[in-house]
Amino acid sequence: MKMHRSARAGLAAVAAAVVVVLAGCSAAPPPLVPTHSADTGALREAVSARDIMDHLEALQDVADANGGHRAAGSSGYEESARYVEEQLRAAGYAPVRQHFTYEDHGEEIETFNILAETGGSDEHTIVVGGHLDSVRRGPGINDNASGVGAILETALRMADSGIEPINKVRFAFWGGEEEGLYGSQHYVDELSGSEAGQHAVYLNLDMVASPNGVRFVHDGDGSTFGDNVPDGSNEIEDVFVDYFADRGLEVLPTPFLDGDSDYAAFLKAGIPSGGLFTGDAGTKSGAEVQGFGGEAGVAYDSCYHESCDTIENVDTDLLEEMADALAHATIAFATATPAEG
C-alpha cells in the first residue's frame, strides 16, 4: 500500500471527484449483475490459508536472499515475479510481463506487471489485482504478499477446478505501487477506449492479513463516505457484504482514497471497482475491538512499511476469510450477466 491511511471516517480524505472518464473512452457497458447464488463452495474450500502461507514463505525467502526487500526494479522483485510466473505456468496459464519505467528520486526504475488470464468473453473483463512489490525497508509480507498470495491461490485453484467463466478473468500483479501506483496506472493508460469500455470490474486486494485487523470492504455505493465512484461499484460491495453476512462475519466500509492503492487508476477510468483491506497504520478503535477482537489503541498493522513486516506479521484466520471472499467474488463476476437496459 502506497501511503499511510486510516479507514476511519473522521480521517478520510475522500476522493469525491475520482471518476474522470478517460478522454476518448467508449461508453461503458451496462454493469454486470453478479451471481450472488453462484456455487463457489468447491473453490473456496480449495483456497486455503495453508497453501497461501506457502506463497508468503516463498516471498519471505526471496526477500531474505535479496537485502531484506522485494522493491520494484530490484533483484528481489525479479525473483518474486519468477516465483509467481512459475506457479501460474504450472497451472496452465500463460503469464506475460507488461514493462514500464518510472523515475524515483532521480533514478529511472525499469520494472513490469505480470498478467495472466482465463478463457471467457473479453467484452466484460474482470481484473483481479494486487501489488507484488514491497517497500525497500522490509519484505512486505502483509503489504502486499498477503494480497498476492490470495490472488495467486485463487487463480491456481480456479484452473484446477475446470470452471469455464462466461467473462474473462485477468489476474494482475502490479509493479511500482509503493513509489506511486505506477504499474496499475500504466496498465490503464495502455488500454484503448474500446478496451477500457470492456473492463467490467476491478477487484483490489492490498493488505488482507493485518495482525490487529478488521474486515474492511470498499464503499462501492458511497453510502458511508460519499465516494463518487463508477456505476457497478455498488454491486462489488454488495457481493462482499452479502458473502460475509451469510457467514455471520461482521464487516466495515472503508473509503476509496485517491492515490492510496491500485484501484485509483481504474476509478479514474470509470471502471467499477472494489475490494478488501484489513488495515495499515491506522489505530483500532474500542468499537472495532467489540466486533473483531484485537487490541484498541494499537495500529491494525504496527509493522506497516517496516522491516518487521515478515511472515510472523500475518493473521492466518483473517487471511483465510479474505481469500475465500475473493474466490467467491471472482466466480460471482466471472459468471455474471450484464444488467438490462
Which ranges hold each PLM region?
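N-terminal hydrophobic or amphipathic helices/low-complexity stretches enriched
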Residues: 29-75, 118-119
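His/Asp/Glu-rich mid-to-C-terminal helical/loop segments that flank catalytic regions of hydrolases
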Residues: 283-341
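Extracytoplasmic/secreted proteins, especially bacterial periplasmic and envelope-associated proteins
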Residues: 42, 51-54, 58, 75-90, ...
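Alpha-helical metal-binding/catalytic segments enriched in His/Glu/Asp
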Residues: 116, 128-181, 326
